[in-house]
Amino acid sequence: MTAPTAPSMAAPPAPSMVSRMTALFLRVLTFAFLMVSLVIMTTNTGTIEIGIDEFKVRSKDFYSYRYMLAAIAFGLTYTILQIALTLNHISKRNGAQTSGDGNLVFDFYGDKVVSYILATGAAAAFGATKELKTQLAGLGGDKFFNKGYASASLLLLGFVCTAILSVFSSYALPKKV
């Protein structure tokens, strides 16, 4: 007598496909964090009251916030490029790399550079927001600075996702190069 066989199941995806899907998930998450951070920061305006005068402030009025916006734009550009490359790889299902080992080297260095840029952008925004909020306390700019904190926090989360991707690319590089 033979034992009944289990119904046939689809084979699990290859390990390289699982890592690409994980990378895609983290890149989409990074994109979402950066996009929301960008929207919050570009639409952030406030009014500071000094005596009888009112001054309208925007994020572009402060150099640290400008740097943060540039870091977000750079991060978004890189993330969109990497999402496109990852989708191309997944659709072709062609092993561990799309265009030779150069793609892994690009991932390795790109993830490192972009994660540092995002980290410094978040740090600049946190530092500027803390300093400005302290200096301008009681002048009516709390809502403006709280949005600055929110935007910097989302940028920091984008950095964390990119840093995790940087670790993944560090592990993938010695295997393929």
Swiss-Prot record:
Extracellular side: 42-66, 129-153
Main location: membrane
Compartments, record wording: Cell membrane
Annotated transmembrane regions: 21-41, 67-87, 108-128, 154-174
InterPro entries in the record: CASP_dom
Keywords: Cell membrane, Membrane, Transmembrane, Transmembrane helix
One GO cellular component, as annotated: plasma membrane
Membrane-side (Cytoplasmic) residue stretches: 1-20, 88-107, 175-177
Signal peptide: none
Record-linked Pfam families: CASP_dom
Source domain of life: Eukaryota
Coiled coil: none
Membrane topology label: Multi-pass membrane protein
PANTHER family: CASP-LIKE PROTEIN 4A4, CASP-LIKE PROTEIN 4D2
Family membership: Belongs to the Casparian strip membrane proteins (CASP) family.
Subunit (UniProt): Homodimer and heterodimers.
UniProt name for this protein: CASP-like protein 4D1
Species per Swiss-Prot/TrEMBL record: Populus trichocarpa (Western balsam poplar)
